[in-house]
């Protein structure tokens, strides 16, 4: 506590023995011990009161935050909250609408302004969309699955200077890629 070693205690004991005398030394040590005990109890009591005041301050802050949350949510009732949610989500899709394949009228169209702003070109007329969003649903709604149109494969000429590959070599390469 005071960083007093055994040698310092021995010196203090010898000085006390000479100054007080051997007859009164036990009474003096008892009195010093009682004072030390009182000082420790007072320090512990002060520390306990300080910790209690800190806990009360924390509880007051928690109560204040709880009251703010309660005041903010007091205007909301369960019915009011549900109506707000249903209004923001819109009407849910019906099961009959989900089972129907998308038709040309249901497919969303991209305006030329939106296509030029996004930097993408409009899809070709022959290209088929596999998944399309229904016009009545939002982006988070389910997608309708439509049959994919098969396009005729057109032969692509290799660039000049490319090595010649026989048809059998291409077929073997394709089979090897499918196997792995």
From Swiss-Prot:
Topology in the lipid bilayer: Single-pass membrane protein
Key words, A-Z: Cell inner membrane, Cell membrane, Membrane, Protein transport, Translocation, Transmembrane, Transmembrane helix, Transport
Annotated compartments: Cell inner membrane
GO biological process, one term: protein transport by the Tat complex
Parts of the chain that traverse the membrane: 1-21
Short name of one Pfam family: TatA_B_E
Example of a GO cellular component annotation carried by this entry: TAT protein transport complex
UniProt xrefs under InterPro entries: TatA/B/E, TatB
Single GO MF descriptor: protein transmembrane transporter activity
Family of the protein in this entry: Belongs to the TatB family.
Subunit structure: The Tat system comprises two distinct complexes: a TatABC complex, containing multiple copies of TatA, TatB and TatC subunits, and a separate TatA complex, containing only TatA subunits. Substrates initially bind to the TatABC complex, which probably triggers association of the separate TatA complex to form the active translocon.
Name the record gives this protein: Sec-independent protein translocase protein TatB
Gene expressing this chain: tatB
């Amino acid at each position: 506590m005071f960083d007093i070693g055994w040698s310092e205690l021995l010196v203090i004991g010898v000085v006390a023995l000479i100054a007080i005398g051997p007859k009164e030394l036990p009474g003096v040590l008892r009195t010093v011990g009682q004072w030390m005990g009182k000082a420790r109890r007072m320090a512990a009591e002060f520390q306990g009161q300080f910790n209690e005041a800190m806990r009360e301050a924390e509880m007051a802050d928690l109560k204040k935050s709880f009251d703010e949350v309660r005041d903010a949510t007091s205007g909301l009732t369960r019915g009011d909250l549900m109506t707000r949610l249903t209004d923001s989500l819109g009407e849910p899709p019906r099961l009959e609408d989900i089972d129907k394949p998308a038709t040309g009228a249901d497919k969303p169209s991209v305006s030329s302004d939106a296509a030029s702003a996004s930097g993408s070109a409009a899809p070709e007329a022959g290209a088929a969309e596999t998944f399309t969003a229904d016009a009545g649903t939002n982006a988070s709604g389910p997608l309708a699955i439509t049959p994919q149109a098969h396009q005729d494969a057109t032969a692509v000429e290799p660039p000049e200077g490319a090595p010649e590959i026989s048809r059998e070599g291409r077929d073997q390469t394709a089979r090897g890629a499918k196997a792995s």
